């Protein structure tokens, strides 16, 4: 068993042993492929994402944990640092600031934190960033609440 797979088995066991606020599910998609994972996250309280649940599609590469995973929102979401078209997440820790000290669990927690702390200067969703840059936080929050209701409030299919 290679070191990436050993590490992923340990991470899965660690997630199963704990109760992580905001991270409802983190597991391999199948028992035979440890390099493709799903996660379900909850929107942070006191944000326009509150009450929503999003499915993340996580692809782990052979060089893990030296190389970062690729993470995509499978559920539609409005956020300046998340692509509306393909769900790609723009975060330094998933690119140039990745460290082997990070885990899939800590990456998911960082994504939950990103929902509260956007960076409108480096957007993947230009329309969302424009609302924030022009100071129209009310319109941004309304758009987020609306799309959260439309896409992230339904029952998530059984992924367990």
Curated annotation (Swiss-Prot):
Active site: 90
Top-rank lineage group of the source organism: Eukaryota
Disulfide linkage: none
TM helices/strands, residue ranges: none
One Gene Ontology CC term in the entry: nucleus
Catalytic activity: S-ubiquitinyl-[E1 ubiquitin-activating enzyme]-L-cysteine + [E2 ubiquitin-conjugating enzyme]-L-cysteine = [E1 ubiquitin-activating enzyme]-L-cysteine + S-ubiquitinyl-[E2 ubiquitin-conjugating enzyme]-L-cysteine
PANTHER family hit by this protein: UBIQUITIN-CONJUGATING ENZYME E2
Family note: Belongs to the ubiquitin-conjugating enzyme family.
Lineage: Eukaryota, Fungi, Dikarya, Ascomycota, Taphrinomycotina
GO biological process assignments: protein import into peroxisome matrix; protein polyubiquitination
Record's keyword terms, sorted: ATP-binding, Nucleotide-binding, Transferase, Ubl conjugation pathway
Residue intervals of the UBC core domain: 3-153
Name recorded for this polypeptide: Ubiquitin-conjugating enzyme E2 16
The gene coding this protein: ubc16
This protein's record includes keyword Transferase: yes
Pfam families named among the record's database cross-references: UQ_con
The protein's role, per its UniProt record: Catalyzes the covalent attachment of ubiquitin to other proteins.
Pathway where it operates: Protein modification; protein ubiquitination
